[in-house]
Amino acid sequence: TAYRNKMEFTFGDAYKDGPLALGLHQKGSFYDILTVDGCEIIGADWSRILTATLAFFSGRNVPFFHRMRHEGILRNLVVRQSRANGQFLINLVTSTQWVTYGFDVKQLLQAFVEMLLELEKSDAFAGSIAGILYTENDALGDVVQSDRMELLYGQDYIEEEILGLKFKISPFSFFQTNTGGCEVLYEKARDYIMRGSVKLDGDKTVFDLYSGTGTIA
């Protein structure tokens, strides 16, 4: 069952010198990437975004960032979706080596945005795209971080709702990745408190500490 509201997909190859892949690390391998089209923990729209993005960059022969040689461009595609309204936040993460490989980054990013917006218009796409971002990351390690971030389209956040509370989630927000599971945990905690020895009234407040934005780490 699809439950994830955030995924960090990695660009790479499925085997040494193989074709471009976009997905998750294969079990037991730091370098080999498995394209996860049709993955059960994400929805169908996610797979459409993944497939379209892979085809876009494969067709233009844009190389992935090699983590041993520290050469290449494409690093990650970070996708978030709100369960409350179905909106997506899509963040393309690359190195800054575009010129080295002869690419016009501005032109290519504009084409990338146009491709995603055309995908959004298709009958098969059920959700909507709230924002598309571009992040530069020249860190040597295999971590998604931002040296510079640019908003390419729309807004730089999505909104989520848990038990009547609304949250604004930015590209690098720390937020529980299973919205439904988080809601169940809060309902259980609230139930235990209400049935326990400590009764809450209008003058009492429950604090959820040490958990990022306050939605269970």
Residue ranges and their predicted role:
Residues 1-217:
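Accessory RNA-recognition modules of RNA-modification enzymes
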